[in-house]
């Protein structure tokens, strides 16, 4: 990828000369879609990002949100999300691992300590060997890196869809903990302060990673693009986490930026640009892993586990001492100035990682200025794209005729609805001793004892939904994540998004992408949940075609305390109620976007959503926290049949009778398998109290009383089906049975 002719002309006009090779490479990377959001930024104003609890919104390495506490001391969380899609196709292990490392360092940049990770993963058809190879490699990379650095992976999602075959998605979110006194931003503060590079030595790995992520994947990407993929070192990252903690605690950092896309050039120029300042950097002062690196390589390499700090001159020696204590490299590479962003290089003085990085030189030869540009123009000067978009249309109804037994087995055993225990058993989700509710439930709960709050975390998307109806499906994804946290008794606080799309230059693709942006923004605004940050990943396109528009949402909610009602039924107690099923109430059951139709090649319009989603979420959270509530479970992927099956255990079964409203064309399949979000199963000893709570908010249907025989018996109209807990486990073990 090279600088477009129109961009080149704009750069020449601004500089008054031809750019140097290093400048041209910087503009190529920082004006790429990956960094500049040239096709998506015009759409992102749709999101509401402000709120009473929002401290720092979009634009920094991570967002900062204050927890609602009664005490005098403010407790902040940070939220960030990133994609590492192209690298994870080329090298699934390192691509996914370095995605984890990058989002953790974004957390460090804000003066926060990382306390939880959530990953949302998307692959091609599970039956294909290549999809399984990517899946296994990505999960191994995430588990290896996350486990080694001691940050628990507590939530996430996994989806399989044909259109990810040539381009998987790896979206990783991180939550951190900080407070007002520790808070740091990526905005340079003062001319004369030093720029200090701390962490691993710089090599040649990851060169051109930002521009690589801004192009469609080619057929030979797995071999030809391997140099653009970084190699992670989680042990160095762990040391960096702990060193950063000391630096923050001692108040040594004025501002900070993680070295990610475009490496040192990206991090340092963005840091000073946000402060309206410039910098003078001596590239040969950077501690290097490989010999004879030139200026461009040092500037753009995306070697991992590195941080750029702004440090007051009197604190530089102490920063170097701390770096040495944690066996991390440390280079004083330059200083903040009031002028341009300037990088110089003296090849004969280039250092290796073993050189003393803080000593002043006794001699100075003639230096070459390789970059001399306005930092703000470099970071913000890229022109935005005005692209045509085709309005998506929803499919016509074409429902298959499948017997109930076949449909039940197929939907329960689909990799999309099957147990993901094979994935999360590889993650250490209890390290840090904050995890109260771990993976496998609707949402994770992480204890923030500093505020006596439970932090509920849900992350995911639904490619079948947004493939069917981008706008409506994205609205549903926001509601689904909110319902997940509400089912565990939490109230939504804030969210970050990762907006994944194909090649935006294709009008149908850009139309779908526009739909997911607007849909996600509209529902989050309705729920009064600010979207405080995020990431955009476009050009997820390959010879296999574009991916489905995929809006991953990582949403957090808060609750008093750390306990939550379980997902599993309590044997022989109370009543099981279904809350919020508009289809059963009205007879307008739609199967669009369902796993049922994906399994049997049908089509339909997407389901209608609740009329007052905010009231629904507030009421679900309140009921979940009531002492009469014994169990709760969100209903969505796979429909009611899957959610009921997930609640059954060897000790607790259920006999349910589901009425099919007269005139419902979707019939039995619609009742069991439609995927309207905003529905919750509630086991309670106070059924009348639940009905009263939801009066005027959502319909409530009684499904029966949990039994003690471990068998699920479902009657729908004139048809019935039975499956005991062992059979359900067998159906839902698809992934583990295949991968071991």
Describe each model-derived feature in a short phrase.
Residues 51, 104, 159-160, 182-186, ...:
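Generic recognition of flexible, low-complexity loop/linker segments
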Residues 33-35, 85-87, 123-126, 160-165, ...:
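Flexible loop/turn segments at secondary-structure boundaries
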Residues 1-66:
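N-terminal amphipathic, basic-rich helices that act as targeting or association modules
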Residues 67-89, 93-97, 101-138, 142-326, ...:
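Mobile "lid/hinge" segments at catalytic clefts and subdomain interfaces of large enzymes
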Residues 5-24, 167-168, 260-411, 523, ...:
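Glycine-/charge-enriched secondary-structure boundary and capping motifs
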Residues 134-152, 279-280, 510-537:
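A glycine-rich helix N-cap at a beta->alpha junction
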Residues 35, 48, 54-94, 98, ...:
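Non-catalytic terminal/interface segments that mediate subunit docking, oligomerization
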Residues 3, 15-19, 28-35, 56, ...:
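Catalytic cores of large soluble enzymes that bind and process phosphate-bearing ligands
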